[in-house]
Amino acid sequence: MGYEEQLDRALEETPDIEGTAARFSVPDPDVRQEGNATVYENFQPTIDRLDREESHVMKFLQNELGTSANIDERGRLRLTGEFRQARVEEAINDYVEGYVICPECGLPDTRLEKENGAEVLRCEACGARSPAGN
């Protein structure tokens, strides 16, 4: 059996590897209106999945949505103003893209670090270092 035949056979027998999307997914934001505030009910499970500090994600959402926010006694994020679920989801997806997913290998196995006062995304999978938030 020649090299090409062996390679073809190996590729046929190798199981397909699921993409990163199947391995990493963020819960859809569960938001509802409560007076003049939007309450992000499942903020804590989202933070747990992102493996980031709640204050960092909250600050990003405040800047992205142009509002103020606080975390209530039940761990829910309360955003001042009315925001649709789709808008909050878009902001969370922007956060994931800039502060969670490695731009080099596309995996979520990253840590946020400070280097010379700047936030850097360090990938534990491929070792890449890149500016966070890009």
From Swiss-Prot:
GO terms for molecular function: translation initiation factor activity. Keywords: Initiation factor, Protein biosynthesis. Residues 1-32 are annotated as: Disordered. Residues 1-12 have a biased composition (Basic and acidic residues). Gene3D superfamilies: 3.30.30.170. Signal peptide: none annotated. SMART domains: eIF2B_5 (SM00653). The keyword Protein biosynthesis applies. The keyword Protein biosynthesis applies. Belongs to the eIF-2-beta/eIF-5 family. eIF-2 functions in the early steps of protein synthesis by forming a ternary complex with GTP and initiator tRNA. Heterotrimer composed of an alpha, a beta and a gamma chain. PANTHER family: EUKARYOTIC TRANSLATION INITIATION FACTOR, EUKARYOTIC TRANSLATION INITIATION FACTOR 2 SUBUNIT 2. This is Translation initiation factor 2 subunit beta. The gene is eif2b.
